């Protein structure tokens, strides 16, 4: 059975800052939600279901925040799903929300993902031993630095590839008034001059800890017909594998290769390098 068409008809984003002390978690989410609904020309009463995305609870120090957020999210008396896939939660939340429309379960779905890490201690949260998992004792940067070095060695990428990406992203962020960082004049040279944190990752290559939220309104084909400029979802794919399996290729995981192949097939793409103009990772 093929997926039913689904489209994004409303988007909303908050200002991202180190500390959003002007709003609570609920207020932060509603800020993004209200903007998405306004963009879609809808009200909460018209929404069939809500999907909320949130990374580990320890990042804010609130367990299962979707429970106390239900009313603020407009989910009282409606289906509410919480998505949590750690660092990929942003993309996973959008996939789950769109699947509810593509499967014909709902016609109008509101999805919101947020972080408010200023209310907790991210370093402490990342230091808690996870049961039944291999201890790393290195933090996120120390964990991924060897992967970056391996990628550079295996792919033949320049050793300063991270600085190239960082300079590009910082420049693009200047076009988004809601972005956390607005660092004008960031260049490859300025990134390379910043402090080394985990070889080969430098300070200016890393992201800040932010408070912020984003929201989407995803609807069925018949509802999208009333929208002036719907953004159609041409493909959604999710693949998984054991993170710490001894045979797993950490640099080029099988799950990533399988997901990419399935996505190109869904979207009718035969040459990604020629046909894809913009790419974003979560």
Task: Annotate the PLM regions.
Residues 2-4, 17-19, 54-112, 116-143, ...:
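Conserved catalytic cysteine-centered active-site region
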Residues 1-26, 163-165, 196-262:
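Condensing-enzyme catalytic core mediating Claisen C-C bond formation in acyl metabolism
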Residues 14, 38-42, 71-75, 102-107, ...:
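Generic secondary-structure signature for well-ordered alpha-helical cores
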Residues 10-55:
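N-terminal beta1-alpha1-beta2 module of alpha/beta enzyme domains
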Residues 26-41, 65, 93, 144-148, ...:
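Short, well-ordered amphipathic alpha-helical segments that serve as non-catalytic structural scaffolds
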Residues 85-115, 141-175, 216-222:
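Active-site-proximal alpha-helical scaffold in enzymes
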Residues 280-282:
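Conserved small/polar residues in nucleotide/adenosyl-binding loops
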Residues 9, 36, 47-50, 97, ...:
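Buried hydrophobic positions in well-ordered alpha/beta secondary-structure cores of metabolic enzymes
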């Amino acid at each position: 059975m093929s997926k039913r068409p689904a489209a994004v008809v409303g988007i909303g984003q908050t200002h991202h800052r180190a500390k959003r002390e002007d709003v609570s978690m609920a207020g932060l989410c509603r800020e993004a939600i209200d903007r998405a609904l306004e963009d879609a020309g809808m009200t909460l009463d018209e929404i069939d279901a809500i999907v909320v995305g949130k990374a580990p609870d320890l990042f804010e120090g609130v367990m299962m925040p979707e429970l106390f957020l239900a009313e603020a999210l407009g989910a009282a008396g409606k289906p509410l799903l919480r998505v949590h896939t750690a660092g990929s939660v942003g993309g996973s939340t959008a996939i789950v929300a769109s699947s509810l429309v593509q499967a014909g379960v709902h016609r109008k779905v509101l999805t919101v993902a947020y972080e408010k890490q200023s209310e907790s201690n991210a370093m402490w949260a990342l230091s808690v031993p996870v049961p039944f998992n291999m201890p790393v004792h290195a933090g996120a940067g120390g964990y991924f630095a060897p992967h970056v070095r391996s990628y550079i060695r295996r792919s033949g990428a320049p050793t300063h590839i991270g600085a190239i990406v960082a300079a590009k992203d910082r420049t693009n962020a200047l076009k988004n008034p809601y972005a956390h960082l607005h660092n004008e004049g960031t260049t490859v040279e300025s990134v390379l001059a910043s402090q080394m944190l985990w070889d080969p990752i430098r300070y200016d290559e890393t992201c800040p800890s932010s408070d912020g939220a984003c929201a989407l309104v995803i609807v069925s084909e018949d509802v999208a017909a009333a929208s002036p400029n719907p953004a159609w979802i041409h493909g959604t794919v999710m693949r998984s594998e054991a993170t710490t399996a001894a045979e797993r290729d950490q640099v080029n995981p099988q799950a990533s290769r399988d997901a990419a192949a399935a996505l190109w097939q869904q979207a009718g793409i035969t040459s990604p390098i020629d046909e894809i103009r913009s790419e974003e990772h979560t």
